[in-house]
Amino acid sequence: MQEIEQRIYLAATYDTKGEEAEYLRQLLRRDGVMVVTVDVATSGQGSPAMVSAQEVAACHPQGAQAVFTGERGSAIVAMALAFERYLAGQRDVGAVLGIGGSGGTALVTPAMRALPVGVPKLMVSTMASGNVAPYVGPSDIAMMYSVTDVAGLNRISRRVLANAAGAIAGAFRQARQPIADDGRPAVGITMFGVTTPCVQHVTAALHDRYDCLVFHATGTGGQSMEKLADSGLLAGVLDLTTTEVCDFLFGGVLACTDDRFGAIARSGVPYVGSCGALDMVNFGALDTVPAACRERLLYPHNPQVTLMRTTAQENARQGAWIAERLNRCEGQVRFLIPEGGVSALDAPGQAFYDEAADAALFQALYDHVRQTDRRRLVRVPCHINDPLFARAAVEQFHEISQ
């Protein structure tokens, strides 16, 4: 079969960003790369783009009329979906470059997020100097701040856009080069600072046989790992640090989404999980902790991070929440119960040590997980950071991944 020539897809709302898009197209063509320009404007006006807004909008499940509504908010949401579906249908996407303000960024980045990790994605945006998590999510999108508004060419915007063109062209070429692969299958492992010793022991034990990909459990970390599982890129998962559930249920700043564990259920990938750092909810600096939580047991982890100890009632709730999702998993699942504590702070003499709270978590798991030959809870009578726990996790993983 003849190899399909890859191209850089350049997406912009041509009714407001056409001048900048054409400037980028010229730079990329001068650099010798093939470019496909795509108009994602919701105004319905004509443009010189190679792919018209009408063609993109037609990819919406309800047709172009769902996009060209005349109402900005709903039109952006609809065009974002249409562009995501359009891009997913193209077989020659070698990289994606987008430019835009808040609307254009919200419109282009969902399609970028849907692409596999490793396909270069660069968004030049007025929003890139703030909180970019809603745009980047679990993907490898690179965000470049436009400095000036994306509203015409000037000496600043020309330089920034020229740098963007050079960056995406370089990434496009590099992505086509083979990278070293020693043949070891990849496993995903979740970690937090307070479960680091556990993960270090696990990765040391697995290193010879597996390429260990460690994800920081910051909300997007878990999403990134599950995105790889959904993409079939992981041979197994050791989800030892499920702390993102605390933040999701109790208002922390490092929350997962409601789809946590969803990729495990969908993919059936061999899964070893545990209760790492389910004793804490993450907030920012101490003065950012919600007023309703100020009288709780708080621990300043550093000047930027304040931790709140979960209660027995909260632990029972999150144990039931996790159990309900584990029950959806039909692949091989082992969920380990570290009876000696779930984090470095949850140990004798440490700030969050609370046997009753931990017992409520463990009991909720026992009460709600429907255990089968393929889905089992495993008692481990030691602390999560004890080398014996890591050994148990590795043994369970080897058992289910043979």
Curated annotation (Swiss-Prot):
- Write out the coiled-coil annotation as residue ranges: none
Taxonomically, the superkingdom here is: Bacteria
Family annotation (Pfam families): UPF0261, UPF0261_C
For this chain, the annotated S-S bridges are: none
Which parts pass through the membrane? none
Q: Which PANTHER family match?
A: UPF0261 DOMAIN PROTEIN (AFU_ORTHOLOGUE AFUA_1G10120)
Q: Give the record's family classification.
A: Belongs to the UPF0261 family.
Q: Can you name this protein?
A: UPF0261 protein BB3289
* Originating organism: Bordetella bronchiseptica (strain ATCC BAA-588 / NCTC 13252 / RB50) (Alcaligenes bronchisepticus)
List the taxonomic lineage: Bacteria, Pseudomonadati, Pseudomonadota, Betaproteobacteria, Burkholderiales
